[in-house]
Amino acid sequence: MVTLIDTISERQVRPRHPEKAHRPDAISPPKPDWIRVRAPTSRGYANTRNIVKENGLVTVCEEAGCPNIGECWDKKHATFMIMGDTCTRACAFCNVRTGLPDGLDPDEPAHVALAVQKLGLAHVVITSVDRDDLADGGAAHFAATIAAIRESCPTTTIEILTPDFLRKEGALEVVVAAKPDVFNHNLETVPSRYQSVRPGARYFHSVRLLQRVKEIDPTIFTKSGIMVGLGEERHEVLQVMDDLRSADVDFLTIGQYLQPTLKHHAVMRYVTPEEFDGYERIAFTKGFLMVSASPLTRSSHHAGEDFARLKAAREAKLQSAG
């Protein structure tokens, strides 16, 4: 008689960041008081979580470990992350799972649209993992999701936060043709930190991507953001502002980098609220229509309220010019 031993049932769970497993722990300084947030416990948070789970959706709020999830979900605000939960890049700052993703779910656009409808969102933010494995980087899936939301929720304004579509010819044009209200693509950090923080991306490609959106459709608002506390110098942050204004970007967000795990890039320092206030004032003087800069600022935080302010700022600028 032969006894078969089942080794599959005890298979270890695949690590979330296998490419970082061999790295020594990176120790960050303790968080200051101004970084602390309350744990999410409200009924509104639970209701939003239930709608997300019932529709089998992924949110960047959960995957990236956003500190604002309790506040946003309590208000029924969620940022949907399409095309799966696994990214083909391995950025040093990001908590999203890395590896080879599954195929696209053709029903996902409809599921996202249904969740938007159930939540009664006036403004929705759609982001995605990087999908370097796809010929178009997922551009058609973005467009399909926008179209599905337009059909089921015609009054909902749509903001997208996209990957860089590096070496994906024609992908950007497909997404812009779907006419999102806001096109966001984050630079994430200053150029000198790209090799250690965002090695799979190219700084000036990202700047050019944002500039190209405006060239294709000047009516679309453009937006970008960076994290600070990664070892950048103040003058480098100001240069990023100038680069984004040269690309006619409307909205800038600046927030504090927070280390997801000890295997991720360390926090080099915590930027004070007063320094964030200074960055915000300078950015407005450089011509941005909208600026949000604070320790807990994230791309999608208060996105609906900020979109209303962004529209008002453009209208005021046009009236003053006329």
UniProtKB/Swiss-Prot annotation:
Q: Name one GO cellular component term.
A: cytoplasm
The residues the entry assigns to the signal sequence are: none
Required cofactor(s)? [4Fe-4S] cluster
Q: Does the keyword Hydrolase apply?
A: no
Q: What is its EC number?
A: 2.8.1.8
Name any one GO molecular function: lipoate synthase activity
* Superkingdom to which the source organism belongs: Bacteria
Q: Residue ranges under compositional bias (Basic and acidic residues)?
A: 8-25
UniProt keyword list: 4Fe-4S, Cytoplasm, Iron, Iron-sulfur, Metal-binding, S-adenosyl-L-methionine, Transferase
Domain Radical SAM core: residue ranges = 73-289
Principal localisation = cytoplasm
| Keyword S-adenosyl-L-methionine on entry | yes
Q: What is this protein called?
A: Lipoyl synthase
Q: Which organism is it from?
A: Afipia carboxidovorans (strain ATCC 49405 / DSM 1227 / KCTC 32145 / OM5) (Oligotropha carboxidovorans)
